[in-house]
């Protein structure tokens, strides 16, 4: 892309600016010095006196308007009028316009020939016919002589000659008058048939159609090299045109006034051209009038011929598609003009010549309505003129002028055909010329003119029609992409349900086969020295994976559909249920959509894409081998050079001022998809004016970005009781998160485990379970990068789990549960409960009659009651001997997922009955509290029966059915402690049975702080508001019972963040997305880059696992994570994302050269106006990356080897500076300067229409940004807790 060099020159003076605008007007104005114009004004004054003076003045203003519009078109577009008409109209329309322009030039030349012949007759007494021949000969002399001159010299000669002639003509008339009579006895009060002929003559004498094309041509030539802005150039042209045509108008007024005084006042009638010349002698008051008359006509004739020789070329080329020499063109026009003049002289003499001159002016006036239609349409077209199109006042004047021309022509034609006026009868029964040629010619010309008027009025410009069609097509395409039909969704849903069972059966069989044939080996689990590295991010996928990612990204617009009809997944929520009345029960039959994303994202089905799966599996194998060889410290930042097709040969990193493909790393399709993704996400929050949409306001999202942000953040530090009332349950250890992130903690956790120890509470080997849910849950936690399942637990961190534990030498598989969404969950849970009950009954542990007496209770409730019965009967064994208990405080989490491996003793079971009595209040997640134990126990090593049995080698453990009986005592007092030692610690130390069964080495530096933070089932907005042990035992089908005022903000924030995760996932699938998330040019931008790096790590891990065990139908997107008080996953993250979006879109706009993408960026920037206020209007403290954004060093991929043997480009360090309003203002100025230099190819639709329109739209939104940002003096607090200037937990780690 070529960049234009703009030279700044000193401001030009008035004369220097006016000369380029004055030269075209001089060449055009000479065409008005001809006998035809004089005769028309003399005839009007002689017949109607002063009545037509005002009308003549209006005609002069119309001429100024038309000539100014013609010049404005050329100045603004850089193209002349004929060229634009050729682009905007079809072939036949252009041909008619070209014939009309040539006919106008012939009529003008005819009057010149007749005038020169009369002048020769007066001076030398030659015959008129001889004078016509002599006048015709000069047409061959001057153009031939001019052809030997250079074009520049010929233009100079003609321009100076035109100026001299015009000056002598106007000054001679005005200075010869002792006083200019200004008396007007009256004005025309009605438009009658008698005055129609004279008015048509005056109109033709005031405006010449083909002068539009000449003026447009020379205006573009004279101002093409000017550095003055277009608005100033247009004003200069208007001033020059007004001055010159005002002088011509004064001359016409003098002639009309003299004719009124001489002829109209005395009752005489002008019959011949000699009578008109006698009046000219009185006007000039000099006996030298014949000589001056001859000189004026001769020079004006030559100048007009030379001007048309240059300007008429464009008419021949663009309209008629004819290529002939200029001299031949001029000779043809002169021959066609001489023929009717000779005929008139031979048949009618001097009287016929006078009538012929008036007749020519009437014919010219009949062509005016056809000529001004394309002129005014082009000038008022925004697609062509852009911001420089004529204003509404100009459009009104143009429309009024056209209607005036058309009305006068209609009145003339009607009077000529049906009228009884003198001139109409004289035309019909003309005896002067002996025939009715004049009448026939006028009638045919009028009919042709009216037909062409109708044709042009019904034919729109191509640019306008193409743009309308493009807008309709784009709207239909966007609707088709954004809103899939109900039929498609139903078909997809039906196929998913039909194939669900088959997929599960295949999955179980494959997993079973793999587990049977896979040998379990030990793996080293080592934590990185620095968990959060500033310059370490995930590298791009290997070629095989990139091929699969491209498959995703190219089809994501059509394949990432929203399953909004499948039970409208809501964020899991559980609240403290005290005694509530029926009026507090709120039945939510359908959750209103806040964002287009649902927890289940539908990605293109890969069942038929076996080749992509095979390639991806091969890529995983290759990656495993490569990872063993690569150094773990050689990491690659996200800010790479993009895909190979966009990398330069220089190998320089960063973002310079090179080409767009080199800088951005995004192809055209990727940039288009990027703008579509951002517009989709922000479209559910803001409209095109930056205002919250009604749906978002109804969900109280304005409170998240407004004054309620502080309350939302402060709410996290309140006590447990206050958090319960607000619908948010605070982790007890969140306050101590910074202390937990010290190096001593990681030093203690980094140690190797002994062979006899167990990796972590989630380190269970995957067993063969008959339940499909267990296999499905196995997929959620496994993010290994191996292909043989023997190193699957080499990951140092589970998805959104902040536990750091030593590695396992026993290679146990992960069994971490995850939040599972979907309509099939209820059936899965019921099947599990049913199988569990049947197993208990078959073993004789529960009487069958007792189980059957439960009536209509669900299997889940029956299982819970059965567990309660076993606990009350004393079946729960005591603690297992030989295991040291770990007495650390834990976060408040869901009761069903707490430390079920801690083998408790029998205790109080009163809360179990209360739990069964209560009912489950939400429908998005079934109750699996009674199944967690069994589901996990079934997968212990060497477990044959699915339970912990001493005889099966399970470590001497018995069934742990009584854990629910004592959980109320364990967690009853946890609500009042935030960041302090737990009461549970004392209980655990005094009662060994309450300790976890699996011990972890505890560092002395950790104190009583917990190594645990929220797990995926404890994520923010999912299950944060637990308060009762029996909450999870309530029926899933019962209605929700929550406090809307307390939980609406939390729910809205959770859904918004979940939608944000979907958006990030779509962005990282774009080819070349490494550039997007690799700039790190601000604190907000760096935070979003880290979020994207974490999401990409998780996505790639899921993709590898799914490719190993087979496609499961739909990838599961877990809920929003939360690691404690300092977690970044809150509403402030959306504000940071907005700042990131503004910065990235402006960066793209800085180097963008496609008007199509300018428009898409404009849409996104319009919506992002809503982010300006929350981001820059208040003092904001930047957030610090937390545990949730960490990527284990063992999974930091090695940087690929450079092709030329050189080291890869260094990672761009984070600047640690905040993006302020001043920063964006500077960037906006650069964008404005950049787009102002963009130009399309002249003569194309892109260069003439798309570029001006795109510049206008983008400049408009940038002006709004400048206005709003200039009023935002307050920015982010760079010295706050999240600043680089302060040493925080993140700063010490990164």
Swiss-Prot record:
The chain crosses the membrane at residues 13-33, 51-71, 106-126, 128-148, 156-176, 195-215, 238-258, 288-308, 335-355, 356-376, 398-418, 441-461. Keywords: Auxin signaling pathway, Chromatin regulator, Cytokinin signaling pathway, Cytoplasm, Endoplasmic reticulum, Ethylene signaling pathway, Membrane, Nucleus, Phosphoprotein, Plant defense, Stress response, Transmembrane, Transmembrane helix. A motif (Nuclear localization signal) lies at residues 1262-1269. Residues 536-550 have a biased composition (Basic and acidic residues). Phosphorylated by CTR1 on at least 4 sites. Phosphorylation of Ser-645 and Ser-924 is involved in repressing EIN2 signaling. Loss of phosphorylation results in nuclear localization of the C-terminus of EIN2. Residues 534-561, 623-662, 1269-1294 are annotated as: Disordered. Changing residue 645 to A: Constitutive of ethylene response in absence of ethylene associated with an increased histone acetylation of H3K14 and H3K23. 85% decreased phosphorylation and constitutive activation of ethylene response. Induction: Accumulates upon hypoxia (e.g. submergences). Expression level is enhanced by a chromatin-dependent epigenetic regulatory mechanism involving both EEN and REF6/EIN6. One of its GO terms (cellular component) is nucleus. Residues 34-50, 127, 177-194, 259-287, 419-440 are extracellular. One of its GO terms (molecular function) is histone binding. NCBIfam families: Nramp_1 (NF037982). Central factor in signaling pathways regulated by ethylene (ET) and involved in various processes including development, plant defense, senescence, nucleotide sugar flux, and tropisms. Necessary for ethylene-mediated gene regulation, and for the induction of some genes by ozone. Acts downstream of ET receptors, and upstream of ethylene regulated transcription factors. Required for cytokinin-mediated processes. Seems to be implicated in cross-talk between ET, jasmonate and other pathways. Probably not involved in iron uptake. 'Oresara' means 'long living' in Korean. Interacts (via NLS) with ETR1. Interacts (via C-terminus) with EER5 and the COP9 signalosome subunits CSN3, CSN6A and CSN6B. Interacts with ETP1 and ETP2. Interacts with CTR1. Interacts with all members of the ethylene receptor family, including ETR1, ETR2, ERS1, ERS2 and EIN4. Binds to MRF3/ECIP1. PANTHER family: ETHYLENE-INSENSITIVE PROTEIN 2 (PTHR11706:SF75), SOLUTE CARRIER PROTEIN FAMILY 11 MEMBER (PTHR11706). The N-terminal (1-560) region seems to be regulated by upstream components of the ET signal transduction pathway, and may in turn regulate the C-terminal region. The C-terminal (454-1294) region regulates downstream events of ET and jasmonate signaling pathways, and can confer constitutive responses to ET. The C-terminal (1047-1294) region is necessary and sufficient for interactions with ETP1 and ETP2. The nuclear localization signal (1262-1269) is required for interaction with ETR1. This is Ethylene-insensitive protein 2. It comes from Arabidopsis thaliana.
